[in-house]
């Protein structure tokens, strides 16, 4: 049985969120089916999710949660070495609605179950209701037998944070200070929540992300830790690129930043796509009241930064862009001891995210 921990915080109990580059037990995913978000009833997205799951499964266990309606389909489309469990959700972004796993120095494993409101609630959320998504973290903890801390009155998505495992959190003001998350809390109060629930000592606040309309600028499209004292940051020199200013500003900030250990960060540049990724086939996405309508030509957020680090590898999104190969080379230079595994994920970008957004790693414990 997985219990709820009440009255203490992870930091008080000696728990911390480990870095993504630390050893992992496995990865969790959800199965897409939402026809008002995914093209053609979600079938192209399902094929892409399956390719991502198979790529990860070469290196560690993958568990995919599927609705009762889609369980048989998901089971049939995924190889036997990938576990499929029945798990209802409103959509398939487990990074954001799933648990943030924590470890301690004695081999313990716990998780944070953040409140989830579909990226902005009634202010600028992407759909309503979101109650099934808000239950995903607890259900995963039940399946995994992991005790959890619930932040009932604090909204946060996993894609809005990165940690180095040594006391430093990376996030954006655009997202965490947005009116749809925690409008009753000051920046200082939000920072304290991050430090207390991630077991950290310092927050690095990048001002803006590159996705103001959907996630309000998640950090996992902009920058991430690749090793202690080292970060990757998006980079663009073309002043006409839609994300030029955000990339330049993030790079300047990180180049002058120090982490919780006092180290000046080493910043690796990671290119953006040469051309913006524009939505196609919007007429195959259902128009439903209460959701944001989709139109051909919309800029989809296609960031190579939205990769996933797993044991011995990096699963890297590819978009059919001129810079795909360059991104793979740059990531290989950042991770010389890991295999870079490219997966074509343009279909996920059309839905509003990418590989990091559709996965949630569970750390390995002793």
Range-by-range predicted roles:
Residues 1-366:
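Histidine/cysteine-enriched polar flanking segments
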């Amino acid at each position: 049985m997985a219990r709820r921990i009440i009255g203490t915080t992870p930091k008080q109990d000696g728990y911390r969120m480990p870095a993504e580059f630390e050893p992992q037990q496995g990865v969790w995913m959800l199965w897409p089916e939402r026809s008002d978000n995914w093209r053609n009833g979600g079938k192209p997205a399902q094929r892409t999710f399956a390719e991502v799951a198979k790529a990860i499964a070469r290196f560690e266990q993958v568990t995919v949660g599927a609705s009762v309606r889609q369980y048989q389909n998901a089971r049939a489309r995924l190889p036997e070495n990938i576990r499929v469990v029945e798990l209802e959700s409103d959509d398939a972004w487990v990074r954001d609605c799933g648990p943030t796993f924590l470890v301690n120095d004695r081999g313990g494993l716990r998780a944070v179950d953040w409140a989830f409101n579909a990226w902005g609630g009634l202010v600028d959320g992407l759909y309503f209701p979101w109650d099934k998504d808000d239950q995903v973290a607890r259900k995963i903890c039940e399946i995994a037998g992991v005790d959890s801390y619930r932040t009932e009155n604090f909204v946060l998505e996993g894609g809005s944070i990165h940690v180095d495992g040594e006391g430093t959190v990376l996030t954006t003001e655009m997202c965490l200070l947005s009116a749809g998350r925690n409008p009753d809390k000051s920046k200082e109060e939000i920072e304290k929540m991050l430090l207390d629930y991630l077991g950290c000592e310092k927050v690095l606040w990048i001002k803006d992300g590159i996705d103001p309309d959907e996630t309000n600028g998640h950090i996992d499209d902009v920058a991430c830790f690749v090793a202690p004292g080292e970060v990757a940051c998006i980079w663009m020199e073309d002043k006409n690129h839609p994300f030029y200013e955000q990339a330049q500003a993030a790079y300047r900030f990180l180049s002058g930043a120090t982490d919780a250990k006092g180290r000046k960060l080493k910043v690796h540049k990671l290119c953006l796509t040469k051309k913006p990724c524009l939505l196609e086939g919007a007429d195959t996405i259902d128009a439903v009241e209460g959701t944001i309508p989709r139109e051909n030509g919309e800029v989809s957020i296609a960031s190579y930064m939205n990769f996933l680090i797993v044991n011995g590898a990096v699963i890297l999104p590819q978009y059919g862009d001129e810079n795909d190969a360059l991104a793979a080379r740059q990531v290989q230079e950042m991770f010389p001891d890991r295999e870079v595994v490219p997966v074509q994920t343009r279909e996920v970008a059309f839905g509003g995210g990418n590989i990091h957004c559709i996965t949630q790693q569970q750390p390995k414990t002793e």
